[in-house]
């Protein structure tokens, strides 16, 4: 079934696909519900969470605490664990019946599989891996004026436009592209985890949230795969998004790569519970694994403390860390762009400065 421009006016509400794992919501759900609340307010529509699973009604109210007006729970034993065929079938069936205007999906492994499949079935567009969303044109223009190097002073914008404006990195993060889907609905977007700020939980809003449970039907013909068992692999992956302290390294460690990484690890340990990140140049050079990358093509982070060691500060990197509460930069080049967004900047050789930082932190803790 395809929806086109003739049907657009019949579509209502902002939807967020909420991902559960083993009966528990994930942090990305709360980020998207929080962002969806802003978009729904801009559009003057309701915010609806769509939750697929089995016996997950009890966790649905939590989504209301972050802004959902309503949560639709689709319940079936085969939805307990994610499978492409079951989830795509159920989600598309509900969408075709309810006709949401916008669907936001987290750009997780599951979301990146589910989103494109549903968009293809619904014959609509999907913008993947978004880092910014707007409906109100005034807010979009404000975003451009503060986050773009473009001179927009002579540009004109259709201020009456109410399409969802979806911004995402393009060409390896060298450009930011804003995409709209004006002729088809629903408008679909996958959103990068960690880029949207989670709102404060409200118990009052949670109690006011309406939860509607739908017991769906799935036939054997609908199910091409079946989850028999899940075996979890023990793998150490750095959690950049959830970290409160991040010490990142850049190309400035090139004269002694292993020594530079070791210094970053020692500094992170000195702070306490810090983790090590890296710029794209570091990851592309193979000095750190890909899950350590900070920036538009890596993770977007906002820790309490972000330390940039030997990072020049390309716009792609700054876009992924500039919302950190406190930014400390160390670079031997006093003109490095990283200093433009740093709260504290130190010009000099990081191999000499970082040991002094470590000693100062230890002395402060022992005082």
Curated annotation (Swiss-Prot):
Its main subcellular localisation, reduced to a broad class, is cytoplasm
Superkingdom, according to UniProt? Bacteria
Chaperone recorded as keyword: no
> SUPFAM superfamilies, alphabetically?
Adenine nucleotide alpha hydrolases-like (SSF52402), DHS-like NAD/FAD-binding domain (SSF52467)
Note the Pfam families from the entry: ETF, ETF_alpha
Offer an example of a GO molecular function term for this protein: electron transfer activity
Sequence similarity: Belongs to the ETF alpha-subunit/FixB family.
Subunit relationships? Heterohexadecamer; tetramer of tetramers. Each tetramer is composed of 2 alpha (AcrC), a beta (AcrA) and a gamma (AcrB) subunit.
- Please give the name of this protein: Acryloyl-CoA reductase electron transfer subunit beta
């Amino acid at each position: 079934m395809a929806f086109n421009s003739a049907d657009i006016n019949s579509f209502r509400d902002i939807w967020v696909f909420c991902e559960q794992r083993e009966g528990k919501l994930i942090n990305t759900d709360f980020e998207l519900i929080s962002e969806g609340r802003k978009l729904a307010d801009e559009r003057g529509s309701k915010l609806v969470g769509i939750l697929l699973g089995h016996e997950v009604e009890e966790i649905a109210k939590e989504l209301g605490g972050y802004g959902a007006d309503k949560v639709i729970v689709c319940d079936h034993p085969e939805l307990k664990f994610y499978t492409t065929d079951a989830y795509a079938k159920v989600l598309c069936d509900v969408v075709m019946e309810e006709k949401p205007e916008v669907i936001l999906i987290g750009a997780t492994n599951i979301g990146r599989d589910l989103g494109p499949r549903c968009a293809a079935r619904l014959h609509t567009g999907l913008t993947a891996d978004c880092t910014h969303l707007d409906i109100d044109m005034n807010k979009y223009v404000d975003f451009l004026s503060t986050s773009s190097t473009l001179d927009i002073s002579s540009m004109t914008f259709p201020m009456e436009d109410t399409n969802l404006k979806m911004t995402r990195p393009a060409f390896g993060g060298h450009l930011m592209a804003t995409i709209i889907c004006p002729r088809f609905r629903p408008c679909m977007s996958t959103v990068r985890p960690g880029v949207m700020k989670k709102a404060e939980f409200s118990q009052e809003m949670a109690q006011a949230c309406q939860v509607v449970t739908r017991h769906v039907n799935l036939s054997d013909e609908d199910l091409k795969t079946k989850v028999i068992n899940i075996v979890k692999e023990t793998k150490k992956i750095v959690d950049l998004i959830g970290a409160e302290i991040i010490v990142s390294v850049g190309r400035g460690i090139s004269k002694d790569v292993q020594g530079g990484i070791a210094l970053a690890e020692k500094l992170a340990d000195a702070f306490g519970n810090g983790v090590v990140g890296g710029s794209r140049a570091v990851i592309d050079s193979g000095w750190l694994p890909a899950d350590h990358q900070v920036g538009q093509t890596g993770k977007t982070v906002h820790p309490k403390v972000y330390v940039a060691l030997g990072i020049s500060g390309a716009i792609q990197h700054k876009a992924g860390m500039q919302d950190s509460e406190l930014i400390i930069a160390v670079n031997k080049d006093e003109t490095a762009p990283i200093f433009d967004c740093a709260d504290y900047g130190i010009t000099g050789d990081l191999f000499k400065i970082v040991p002094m930082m470590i000693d100062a932190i230890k002395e402060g803790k022992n005082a």
